[in-house]
């Protein structure tokens, strides 16, 4: 593992540690034992489970299923770079490779796991991890392909100029969301890129959006990790009491961002305090 990849993994795990330091005691004090009322999976407060969750081997929060698959994808990133940087690489071939992996995830893995010799493996941590990594791999790899071949720049070149671009972008975004609704997550690798491009191009001209995005960006990973505590572990009555789905989303976003900002600045302040103590100690030694 390169130093850069190791640092990214450490930074990602540090987010998880900081959230767990705050929210595990809250869960424990409130007596939370299940992710939700219908779940058979229970939270384990023993030392081993907490440590394994902090390292990504177990999911303390059920919505954190992506932690270990993402770490594996980071570890695999140098291999993906080598594949994309091979001689005579081209977009069409790379796209076919991603499509093949996606089809294998959609049809091959379920068929493979149905064989008697793999039935027991399917439900294990490693079996679930394998399925999740293969599912996420096309999306992750296609993002790298988009970057290598500057696909967004190509979109920009073929997009109508001026005010005519907005109906096209709106159609692409709406079509993407509709296809996602109809097809589910199986073809995310193909849909996400155009959807992101269309949405970004539609809103980036709105005054203040870029500034807000930059300010909110520092909290977004915390929001990603924290929001499910309010939805699935505690706070459901408050969050869902608003009834209207749009209001529920807005309230959840506000609560999650406020919590994320509090956690961010708490640990930022602690980090600065530790640095000052170290500097003072070094001066006096």
Language model segments and positions:
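Transmembrane alpha-helical segments and their boundary/interface "anchor" motifs
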Residues: 1-59, 73, 161-168, 215-225, ...
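Membrane-interface helix-boundary motifs at transmembrane edges
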Residues: 1-7, 80-92, 148-161, 204-215, ...
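Residue-level signature of transmembrane alpha-helical entry/exit and packing/kink sites
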Residues: 3, 12, 66, 94-95, ...
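Alpha-helical transmembrane segments of multipass membrane proteins
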Residues: 19, 23, 27, 77, ...
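Hydrophobic alpha-helical segments with transmembrane-like composition
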Residues: 27-31, 42-112, 127-142
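Interfacial loop-to-helix transition and helix-capping segments at the boundaries
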Residues: 54-69, 109-139, 173-197, 241, ...
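Hydrophobic transmembrane alpha-helices
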Residues: 73, 77-85, 139-152, 196-205, ...
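Alpha-helical transmembrane segments of multi-pass integral membrane proteins
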Residues: 166-275
């Amino acid at each position: 593992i390169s130093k850069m990849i190791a640092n990214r993994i450490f930074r990602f795990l540090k987010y998880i540690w900081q959230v767990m330091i705050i929210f595990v005691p809250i869960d424990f004090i409130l007596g939370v034992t299940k992710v939700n009322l219908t779940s058979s999976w229970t939270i384990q407060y023993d030392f081993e489970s907490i440590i394994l969750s902090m390292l990504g081997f177990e999911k303390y929060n059920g919505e954190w299923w992506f932690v270990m698959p993402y770490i594996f994808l980071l570890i695999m990133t140098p291999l993906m770079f080598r594949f994309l940087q091979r001689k005579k690489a081209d977009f069409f071939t790379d796209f076919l490779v991603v499509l093949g992996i996606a089809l294998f995830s959609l049809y091959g893995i379920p068929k493979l796991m149905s064989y008697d010799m793999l039935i027991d493996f399917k439900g294990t941590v490693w079996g679930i991890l394998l399925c999740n990594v293969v599912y996420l791999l096309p999306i992750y790899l296609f993002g790298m392909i988009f970057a290598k071949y500057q696909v967004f720049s190509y979109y920009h070149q073929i997009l109508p100029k001026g005010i005519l671009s907005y109906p096209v972008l709106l159609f692409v975004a709406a079509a993407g969301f509709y296809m996602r609704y109809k097809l589910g997550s199986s073809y995310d690798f193909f849909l996400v890129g155009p959807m992101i491009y269309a949405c970004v191009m539609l809103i980036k001209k709105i005054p203040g959006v870029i500034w807000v995005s930059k300010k909110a960006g520092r909290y977004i990973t915390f929001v990603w990790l924290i929001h499910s505590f309010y939805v699935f572990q505690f706070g459901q009555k408050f969050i869902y009491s608003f009834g209207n789905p749009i209001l529920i989303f807005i309230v959840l976003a506000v609560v999650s961002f406020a919590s994320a900002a509090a956690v961010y600045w708490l640990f930022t302040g602690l980090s600065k305090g530790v640095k000052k103590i170290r500097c003072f100690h070094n001066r006096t030694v």
